[in-house]
């Protein structure tokens, strides 16, 4: 903050947006190579560069916020607005998937047999793994709230316990989802039902993995005493994101698994 007459953070030039964009290009190109040519080399390269970019960018943000004091109240306010806008954009992203699902299911075309689920599709039982997944995510919503309140009260041990439980539940959800995909009696290529089901639930699963990664970073930061009861926006943003993931799943469960079956 030396030689500065304002409370805002002037970010130094960083290579990570460029490497992040390149890793995204490599991953999307790698997916095409994997789908069409059964080659995972480009995809693995993209994932590796993405992981390296995430690690180093997160490291820089932690340095700037925790050790250099750049995250003043004004900067934190801007970050909060940014996170809110990001979550709104994610809501609109998922709105597109729900629109596709309801557009197809509320007025099934003759090609689908005039019914929903389409003729020949055997949907998953919503009272089996999907209901367990719902319980797991709802429980994780409770534990992340417990972690947040413990942090605000300065109870470090309870915060760590609650955060660990949330991460464990997030990983468990991902494993359950993977087993459900493996055992599903239909695939992404089974018409509009398969494509809307796997794209909507798959993108939600990706968001759970991203949210779990965010929480794991917060867990290690808390182990190193990075958060205080009044300076913990990194954790707060992760908690907001996790609640968003939780709410989206409830809509997915009610729409696609329960009503759609």
From Swiss-Prot:
InterPro entries: Cyt_c/ubiquinol_Oxase_su3, Cyt_c_oxase_su3_dom, Cyt_c_oxidase-like_su3, Cyt_c_oxidase_su3-like_sf, Cyt_c_oxidase_su3_a-hlx. One of its GO terms (molecular function) is cytochrome-c oxidase activity. It is a multi-pass membrane protein. It catalyses: 4 Fe(II)-[cytochrome c] + O2 + 8 H(+)(in) = 4 Fe(III)-[cytochrome c] + 2 H2O + 4 H(+)(out). Its main location: mitochondrion. Residues 1-15, 67-72, 153-155, 224-232 are mitochondrial matrix. The chain crosses the membrane at residues 16-34, 41-66, 73-105, 129-152, 156-183, 191-223, 233-256. GO terms for cellular component: mitochondrial inner membrane; respiratory chain complex IV. Keywords: Membrane, Mitochondrion, Mitochondrion inner membrane, Translocase, Transmembrane, Transmembrane helix. GO terms for biological process: mitochondrial electron transport, cytochrome c to oxygen; respiratory chain complex IV assembly. Residues 35-40, 106-128, 184-190, 257-261 are mitochondrial intermembrane. Component of the cytochrome c oxidase, the last enzyme in the mitochondrial electron transport chain which drives oxidative phosphorylation. The respiratory chain contains 3 multisubunit complexes succinate dehydrogenase (complex II, CII), ubiquinol-cytochrome c oxidoreductase (cytochrome b-c1 complex, complex III, CIII) and cytochrome c oxidase (complex IV, CIV), that cooperate to transfer electrons derived from NADH and succinate to molecular oxygen, creating an electrochemical gradient over the inner membrane that drives transmembrane transport and the ATP synthase. Component of the cytochrome c oxidase (complex IV, CIV), a multisubunit enzyme composed of 14 subunits. The complex is composed of a catalytic core of 3 subunits MT-CO1, MT-CO2 and MT-CO3, encoded in the mitochondrial DNA, and 11 supernumerary subunits COX4I, COX5A, COX5B, COX6A, COX6B, COX6C, COX7A, COX7B, COX7C, COX8 and NDUFA4, which are encoded in the nuclear genome. Belongs to the cytochrome c oxidase subunit 3 family. This is Cytochrome c oxidase subunit 3. It comes from Eudorcas thomsonii (Thomson's gazelle). The gene is MT-CO3.
């Amino acid at each position: 903050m030396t030689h500065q007459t304002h409370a805002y953070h002037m970010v130094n030039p960083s290579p990570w947006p460029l490497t992040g964009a390149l890793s995204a290009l490599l991953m999307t190109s790698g997916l095409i190579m994997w789908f069409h040519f059964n080659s995972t080399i480009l995809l693995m390269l993209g994932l590796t560069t993405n992981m390296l970019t995430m690690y180093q960018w997160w490291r820089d943000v932690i340095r700037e916020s925790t050790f250099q004091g750049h995250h003043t109240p004004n900067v934190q306010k801007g970050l909060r607005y940014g996170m809110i806008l990001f979550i709104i954009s994610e809501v609109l992203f998922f709105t597109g998937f729900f629109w596709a699902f309801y557009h197809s299911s509320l007025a099934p075309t003759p090609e689908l047999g005039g019914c929903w689920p389409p003729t020949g599709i055997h949907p998953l039982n919503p009272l089996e793994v999907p209901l367990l997944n719902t319980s797991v995510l709802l429980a994780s919503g409770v534990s992340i709230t417990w972690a947040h309140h413990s942090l605000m009260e300065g109870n470090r041990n309870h915060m760590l316990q609650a955060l660990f439980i949330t991460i464990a539940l997030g990983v468990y959800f991902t494993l359950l989802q993977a087993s459900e995909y493996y055992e599903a009696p239909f695939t992404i290529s089974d018409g509009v039902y398969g494509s809307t089901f796997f794209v909507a639930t798959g993108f939600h699963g990706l968001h759970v993995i991203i949210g779990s990664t965010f929480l794991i970073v917060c867990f290690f930061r808390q182990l190193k005493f990075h958060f205080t009861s009044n300076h913990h926006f990194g954790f707060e943003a992760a908690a907001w994101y996790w609640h968003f993931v939780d709410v989206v799943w409830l809509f997915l469960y009610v729409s696609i698994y329960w009503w759609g079956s």
